[in-house]
């Protein structure tokens, strides 16, 4: 059984060009001026040494990062002039004057930076190879901007900072998920020792800073207290007065940012629609994040729905202590740039951010007001199904996405807010006996790249006699720039089927 497929007739004259070549060899092409340079070996025989933008790394059995992911490193969309992510980043930065910005931090970090420094437990699913891209057991592509949090606190160059960067996660394939996306995190801290030297109360100093934040007139729902003993506790060593002041500064700062963002989005929307003017509303919701406490999410009522915009909270004191600034206390937040840009511009598909098509890029300018994105065409989709039996010894696991806590704010130890961060310990070697949905997603991305719009599990069952599990996935192929032919999608789909067998050991149905 080869599965179901459906394709509409193709119009190959829409755009002149060919499908991107599918490299099954583990090669990343670079440029003479730099970029990524990597040669040698096929996927099945992982290269021992790779060089990425002039930096050398040794790989081991943990290596699971395909060349297509490594090739994204030089793109740095958040730094490209007139790119919607750059415009969004600068809009947010404008609301934090005096904060030091870090926008070009290298994406390859140690597991200590990405996990240990934030108190991630050793058994946290975010450490798994099913969720994270590894070069070796000690080196990963950062899964969040918080990988740089401890180092930035340690450098202590400013009271407030903003970090914007590309981050990498093995995840679902659909219009709102991409293995490379962009986050911004911010933090603001105060020095208790300086307050003592000035013979001032720290809470009083923070309240004075609150008064400097621009006022707004939007409706804010915030029914909960600044902290709660059980739901949203204080950390050991933090006084109620300090936390109340820190929470007020955090919330007023982020409300100011959100007002700016959504007023810009409203202006863009007003230029193209006649919808009635609806006043902006925001609300604060108690939350749990492993490296902040107390913690909150900020939601905005937008076009009839409450949308979660960001996560934030009072920084876990062990992070500051281990960064050699135990005298400092403060807050941190994290926000996804693609999510905000999609709202700002009404961009319907996250893959568009990676497009080099002038019909997309020409719609954005840092020198002009924000305008709603106008789709240049909707080319027909082509779906194909693939069904297979798992190996008899395999167990199935879905995509966990555990590392996808609030960007730039958290970890996963319920007591992590008050306890010291544990030292790194030996991690068990990767296991290959179980099936994980993210492996299917990764193979689909490797074969089809941005030509695959989404991948969905449509059916599964266990055979009553053999106890073997059958899975069926629907692959939706769609090019954003031209119509795919049946021949092209058939070729892609056959490659995908072959790789499922080669990599996962499944039996096609």
Task: List PLM regions with ranges.
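TRNA-recognition modules of translation machinery and tRNA-sensing kinases, especially anticodon-binding
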Residues: 7-454, 458-467, 472, 481-483, ...
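N-terminal targeting leader peptides, primarily classical Sec-type signal peptides for secretion
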Residues: 1-5
């Amino acid at each position: 059984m080869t599965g179901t497929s459906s394709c509409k007739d193709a119009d190959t004259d829409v755009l002149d060009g060919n499908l991107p070549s599918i490299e099954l060899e583990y090669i990343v092409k670079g440029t003479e001026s730099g970029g990524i340079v990597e040669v040698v070996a096929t996927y099945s025989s992982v290269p021992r040494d790779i060089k990425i933008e002039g930096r050398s790394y040794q790989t081991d059995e943990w290596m699971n990062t395909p060349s297509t992911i490594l090739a994204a490193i030089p793109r740095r969309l958040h730094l490209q002039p007139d790119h919607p992510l750059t415009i969004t980043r600068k809009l947010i930065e404008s609301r934090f004057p005096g904060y030091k910005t870090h926008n070009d931090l290298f994406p390859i970090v140690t597991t200590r930076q990405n996990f240990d420094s934030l108190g991630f437990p050793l058994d946290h699913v975010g450490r798994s190879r099913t969720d994270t891209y590894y070069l070796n057991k000690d080196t990963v592509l950062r899964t969040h901007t918080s990988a740089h949090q401890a180092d930035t606190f340690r450098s202590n160059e400013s009271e407030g900072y903003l970090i914007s960067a590309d981050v990498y996660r093995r995840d679902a394939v659909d219009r709102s998920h991409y293995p490379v996306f962009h986050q911004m995190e911010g933090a603001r801290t105060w020095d208790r020792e300086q307050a003592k030297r000035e013979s001032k109360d720290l809470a009083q100093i923070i309240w004075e800073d609150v008064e400097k934040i621009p006022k707004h007139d939007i409706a804010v729902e915030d029914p909960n207290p600044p902290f709660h003993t059980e739901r949203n506790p204080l950390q050991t060593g933090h006084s109620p007065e300090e936390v109340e002041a820190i929470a007020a500064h955090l919330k007023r700062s982020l409300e100011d940012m959100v007002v700016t963002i959504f007023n810009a989005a409203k202006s863009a929307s007003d230029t193209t629609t006649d919808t009635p003017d609806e006043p902006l509303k925001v609300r604060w919701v108690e939350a749990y994040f492993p490296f902040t406490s107390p913690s909150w999410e900020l939601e905005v009522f937008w076009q009839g729905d409450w949308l979660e915009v960001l996560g934030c909270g009072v920084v876990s004191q062990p992070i500051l202590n281990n960064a050699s600034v135990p005298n400092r206390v403060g807050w941190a937040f994290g926000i996804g740039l693609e999510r905000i840009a999609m709202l700002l511009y009404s961009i319907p598909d996250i893959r568009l951010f990676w497009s080099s098509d002038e019909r997309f890029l020409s719609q954005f300018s840092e020198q002009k007001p924000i305008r709603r994105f106008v789709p240049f065409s909707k080319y027909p989709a082509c779906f194909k199904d693939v069904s297979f039996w798992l190996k008899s010894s395999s167990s199935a696991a879905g995509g966990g996405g555990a590392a996808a806590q609030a960007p730039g704010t958290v970890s996963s130890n319920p007591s992590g807010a008050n306890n010291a961060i544990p030292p790194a310990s030996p991690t068990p070697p990767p296991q290959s006996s179980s099936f994980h949905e993210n492996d299917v997603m990764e193979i689909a991305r490797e074969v089809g790249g941005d030509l695959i719009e989404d991948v969905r599990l449509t059916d599964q069952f266990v055979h009553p006699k053999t106890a073997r599990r059958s899975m069926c996935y629907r692959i939706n192929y769609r090019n954003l720039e031209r119509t795919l032919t049946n021949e092209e999608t058939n070729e892609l789909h056959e490659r995908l089927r072959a790789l499922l067998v080669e990599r996962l050991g499944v039996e096609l149905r």
